Amino acid sequence: MYDNSMKIEFISKSQNESFARVSVAAFVSQLDPTLDELTDVKTAVSEAVTNSIIHGYENKEGIVKIEASIKGRELILIVEDNGIGIENIDMAMQPLYTSKPELERSGMGFTVMETFMDSLQVESEKNKGTRLIMKKVFNSLS
């Protein structure tokens, strides 16, 4: 069982990326994170939500769901969409790979998430959507 959890969902508009980032940051604040820890989580959320909007829904309207749970000092963060899915997860997770080169995307989203979180798991099914499960243990003291 979790010590605390929250769920939000919102329309896949780029304007909502900052809402998602701030919402998760506010939830995580109960762990009294360092500024670096908080920045890491906000950056990972930003990348995950941006991926859902640009790649999952291809800038069409859909719903992005975020679930955040705390167990002890660990944050479990799930970002999910019902978009087009990822055809080849291994390829998509390679640094500098982008499925949208015409948009001048950097292809670093998954690399950023892996760098700033302790773990990243990607589940995806073509034409059904993608689910990212990220975890981070907070070392700061309450």
Curated annotation (Swiss-Prot):
What keywords does the record list, in alphabetical order?
ATP-binding, Kinase, Nucleotide-binding, Serine/threonine-protein kinase, Sporulation, Transferase
Intrachain disulfide bonds: none
- Family designation: Belongs to the anti-sigma-factor family.
Q: What is its EC number?
A: 2.7.11.1
Q: Does the keyword Metal-binding apply?
A: no
Q: Which GO terms describe its molecular function?
A: ATP binding; protein serine kinase activity; protein serine/threonine kinase activity; sigma factor antagonist activity
What the protein does comes down to: Binds to sigma F and blocks its ability to form an RNA polymerase holoenzyme (E-sigma F). Phosphorylates SpoIIAA on a serine residue. This phosphorylation may enable SpoIIAA to act as an anti-anti-sigma factor that counteracts SpoIIAB and thus releases sigma F from inhibition.
Top enzyme category: transferase
- Record's superkingdom? Bacteria
Residues in a coiled coil are none
Entries under SUPFAM superfamilies matching the protein: ATPase domain of HSP90 chaperone/DNA topoisomerase II/histidine kinase
Under catalytic activity, the entry for this protein gives:
L-seryl-[protein] + ATP = O-phospho-L-seryl-[protein] + ADP + H(+); L-threonyl-[protein] + ATP = O-phospho-L-threonyl-[protein] + ADP + H(+)
* Protein name per UniProt: Anti-sigma F factor
The family database entries (Pfam families) matched by this protein are listed as: HATPase_c_2
Give the source species.
Answer: Clostridium kluyveri (strain ATCC 8527 / DSM 555 / NBRC 12016 / NCIMB 10680 / K1)
- GO BP of this protein: asexual sporulation; negative regulation of sporulation resulting in formation of a cellular spore; sporulation resulting in formation of a cellular spore
InterPro entries hit by this protein: Anti-sigma-factor_SerPK (IPR050267), Anti-sigma_F (IPR010194), HATPase_C_sf (IPR036890)
